[in-house]
Amino acid sequence: MNLRGYSYRLVKANKAADSKHIGVKLGRYCITNDIPVIQIAQQFSVSRMTVYNWFSGIVMPHKATVAQIEKLLSK
């Protein structure tokens, strides 16, 4: 796994978070596929901090965003 662009701390937090959380699933997908946080933030019109919080399982995305994330993850 290439960690370029992701800190060890974020990767560790993502691995420790509940894998049932859609934001955590998104984080694992992005880390594995080396997709930058800024790209996800722009795609979903949120801040980078929001994306980091999703990846860590701290907050859940809004319902409308969850549907968009599920669509992205199903590709």
Regions found by a protein language model. Name each.
Residues 26, 37, 66:
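Helix-turn-helix DNA-binding elements, focusing on the entry/boundary residues of the two helices
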Residues 18-22, 46, 64:
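Alpha-helix N-cap/N′ positions at the starts of helices
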Residues 63-75:
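DNA major-groove recognition helix of helix-turn-helix/homeodomain DNA-binding modules
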Residues 1-6:
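Intrinsically disordered, low-complexity and often Lys/Arg-enriched segments
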Residues 7-33:
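A short, Lys/Arg-rich alpha-helix, primarily the initiator
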Residues 46-60:
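Recognition helix of helix-turn-helix/homeodomain-like DNA-binding domains
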Residues 39-41:
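Short alpha-helical "recognition helix" segments of helix-turn-helix
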